[in-house]
Regions:
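Helix-start/capping segments and mature chain N-termini
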Residues: 1-93, 101-105, 131-334
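Short, glycine/charge-rich beta-strand/loop segments that flank catalytic centers
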Residues: 95-104, 114-129
């Protein structure tokens, strides 16, 4: 058996560069509070192993969409990050305004006009114990990467879902957007094993909760837009905006109402439309659930209209868009 090499610093950095995989071309820029700046070399986009985000999951995160050089709903996503941090008892490493500026400047350093901007707030590095008392202080990371593209068939033909057997998170943890996503991952794996596109969490009372990392909404046969309350699920930023769109459709006569209330599974199965909603998937129609057709088994008109409204909003809603300061980008000289 060959002896494991002990690298010099230069050899280790060279090894990191050689180990870069093909998908790393989709990673454009990363800010690390540990470094105190931004790197654009994917080989250097690393997090210390002793950061409690890595070995304890004591961290929260959020993601904003970068579209046409603008960050969509940045402030709403940042506010949720801070609220999640409070729930996880994580002190902010910087004031809110500074966190916001770091996100914007990292987006600028990427020189990309479209993509995803994800950011993490962690208990930070300092050891391998359980509690954060050993940590030297909270850490903050930002990465700009190519946005996940879902198959066009999801929108043109509709999605197929199954009821997940994975236990739903308790409300306290469901409402915090933490890095503990094992149940969410298992939902997706289970769905793929059952030849479906995604899964649906059902709570202990038999009420619809949410999908893997998306909200679930319905249109009833009498054209009422339905969504579960947010007391035991994550308060999605996108679904809150879509609820605004749904209210507009009520005013325009496309819907007869909007209702936030518990949705029993059997009632949900009889809906005219079902859809998944989130910042990456946007609004995707569901045409089959546990092998049973939803409505007529085809993508519905309300889901299509809400997707159209979302796309328009990401390009023209000035109150939801924050410009990225590309012209202010500076690079280190070291």
């Amino acid at each position: 058996m060959a002896q494991i090499p002990v690298f010099t610093t230069e050899q280790a950095i060279d090894g990191l560069r050689q180990a870069i995989h093909g998908k790393a071309v989709n990673f454009y820029a990363m800010y690390s509070s540990i470094l105190g700046g931004v790197v654009t070399d994917p080989a250097l986009m690393v997090v210390p192993l002793d950061d409690h985000m890595v070995h304890r999951g004591h961290a929260v995160f959020d993601t904003a969409t970068l579209t046409h050089g603008m960050l969509y709903q940045l402030d709403a996503h940042l506010d949720r990050l801070i609220k999640s941090a409070e729930g996880a008892r994580l002190p902010l490493p910087f004031p809110r305004q500074q966190l916001r500026q770091i996100i914007l400047e990292t987006a600028a350093a990427s020189q990309r006009r479209d993509g995803s901007v994800r950011y993490w707030l962690s208990a930070g590095p300092g050891g391998y114990g359980l509690g954060p008392a050993e940590c030297i202080g909270s850490s903050f990371y930002v990465i700009v990467f190519k946005q996940e593209a879902y198959p066009q068939s999801y929108y043109q033909e509709g999605m197929r879902l199954v009821t997940s057997q994975v236990p739903i998170k308790p409300p306290l943890f469901a409402r915090i957007k933490s890095t503990n996503y094992l149940p969410n991952v298992l939902v997706v794996l289970e769905a793929k094993e059952r030849d479906a596109d995604n899964g649906v969490f059902i709570d202990q009372r038999g009420m619809v909760a949410e999908s893997s990392n998306m909200n679930v909404a319905f249109v009833t046969q009498d054209r009422v837009f339905r969504h579960p309350p947010f007391d035991a699920i994550l308060a999605g930023i996108t679904i809150h905006r879509v609820l605004d769109f749904a209210q507009r459709l009520v005013q325009q006569g496309g819907l007869n109402g909007v209702r936030l209330a518990d949705i029993p599974v059997e009632e949900a199965r009889n809906a005219a439309e079902m859809m998944l909603i989130g910042s990456s998937i946007k609004v995707a129609p569901v045409v089959e659930w546990d092998g049973q057709k939803i409505g007529d088994g085809k993508p519905g008109p309300i889901a299509a209209k809400l997707l159209e409204m979302w796309n328009e909003d990401t390009q023209s809603a000035n109150d939801q868009l924050v410009g990225v300061p590309y012209e202010q980008e500076t690079r280190g000289t070291a």
